[in-house]
Amino acid sequence: MTERFDLALLKGRLLPDAPVELQRLPVASVAVVVNPEDRGGSILLIRRTERSGDPWSGQIGFPGGHKSPEDQGLLQTAIRETREEVGIILDRHELLGALPMVTTHSRRVQVAPFVFALKSDVAMQMNREVTETFWVPLSELNRLDVKSREVKVEEGRLEVDSFDYGGRIIWGLTFRILNLLLGRGLEGHV
């Protein structure tokens, strides 16, 4: 029998409110969705559709995107983008808190990660921006080897730290957010 993930432990180690924005950069937010019932706690990741001109084309990430003028705040951005991209209505689930603001490697966008726990099973409905959804058990993230690799970015090529999860390369913003999550003391929990 698999243990249930300890949501109270995670909630106690997150920021209770949205992280502080730097006024000089555009903002976006993502939803770090935890399924506490799946293999002792799993995280939802997506593969973005490959599109010309999209700097995140084909990359592994979290549901999320840029803040729209109609969004009341970054939390609403994460909720809206998750509903649009994968069909999960986060209002029906539990907001655990936030992680600190993360800036993209190009320093063009700052991203607020909000952490949610599912209260029930969900059926994914991907839109055109997403080609794949998958769950990564936290216990497996703790065992993945961090490797340096060269990736193609808008500016050319960049040497980055990354995880390889079943042939899916997790690097950049997603890699840093996952490390922030694991750095909340969860590595000893799973």
Where are these regions (language model features)?
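N-terminal leader/linker segments that precede catalytic domains of diphosphate-processing enzymes
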Residues: 1-62, 66-122, 130, 151-153, ...
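Amphipathic alpha-helical blocks and their helix-capping loop/short-beta junctions
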Residues: 126, 130, 135-157
